[in-house]
């Protein structure tokens, strides 16, 4: 006791220092674990966001292949290439029989009758045959361009729709999380952390309900919004084809069906056609494809009525209105025009690689992805048209699990991925 009394101040000071050190260390540890937990939650949230984004793109790819035949079948029917070819062949047969007769006889008298039989074809018949060749040229080229553009617009619009919905559902889940936190604090409960909810699958559940049983996705609204893809599949592609046909007429009508083209000449004609489709009024100002992708406002309820599973009245409510307005804003943006242009360009690149075979192209060198075409090679236009006609089948075929080289290449366009990421991460949109 005497020792304690003599050193009371020192002992108290030592105890105070020890207690302060303990409290300080405990505070530092708590702060450390708090920061560590926050970083872990943020990392988990980013990983879940990335997973949801990637899953969204895979869902879009599947949807594209599921819808492809619904879009390309009427396009193929609009352009009866095989029917025109059959009519041309039927007009060749009499001439072929005359030529066969000419080659099988040595009589000069018989030989003199051949021009008489040949000239028996009326001027009207010759004009009809010429017109058929013009029709075959326009129809074959218009079909190829319409299919490439239809594929590109289907990819663009499906990605846009599903990323808008995916982002909206993600933001709704975050709002629901914040609400859970506020309710937990008000009742004196400890609200689950962001990381806990992520681990529980709160942000990974795409079925439409949270782990707390609250609906965070409105399936009826989603279905109404997705119904607007009907417009491209049934109406939009028609105006798209008309836009393509006008460009094809302006570029290709001066080209004779009997012309011989080099690969560079063909590439230049293809490029001019794309330019007129994308920029029909001003080369420096591309037109958007809003009228091909979304209906005018006065026809929106008509589009909603096309959904047989929706028994409710076809009314565009406030939330759906905001979704459609945002979709239109994205379509009219300069970034969207660039993405669609790049999608079409990538599809036409595959198309040109296939046509290069007609020019006797050799396989690409190891340092170049493109086939090697002799600059002096010339090919008659009918041979080029025949190859174009074969490519249409590859552009049009598609269903989940079936490969389509054109769709695969377009889906890999970097500008499309970047645009999808911008859409998915635009969290400032009002819910």
From Swiss-Prot:
Main location: membrane
Transmembrane regions: 11-28
Location of the region described as Disordered in the Swiss-Prot/TrEMBL record: 95-126
Keywords: Membrane, Peroxisome, Peroxisome biogenesis, Transmembrane, Transmembrane helix
InterPro entries per the UniProt record, alphabetical: Peroxin-3
Ranges of biased composition (kind: Polar residues): 112-121
Cellular component, GO annotation: peroxisomal membrane
Pfam families from the UniProt entry: Peroxin-3
Superkingdom as given in the UniProt entry: Eukaryota
Peroxisomal topological domain residue ranges: 1-10
Cellular location(s): Peroxisome membrane
Cytoplasmic side: 29-431
Membrane topology, record value: Single-pass membrane protein
Leader peptide range in chain numbering: none
Any single biological process term in GO: protein import into peroxisome membrane
GO function term, MF aspect, one: protein-macromolecule adaptor activity
Biological function: Involved in peroxisome biosynthesis. Seems to directly or indirectly sequesters components of the peroxisome biogenesis machinery.
Homology family: Belongs to the peroxin-3 family.
Protein name: Peroxisomal biogenesis factor 3
Organism for this UniProt entry: Yarrowia lipolytica (strain CLIB 122 / E 150) (Yeast)
Gene label: PEX3
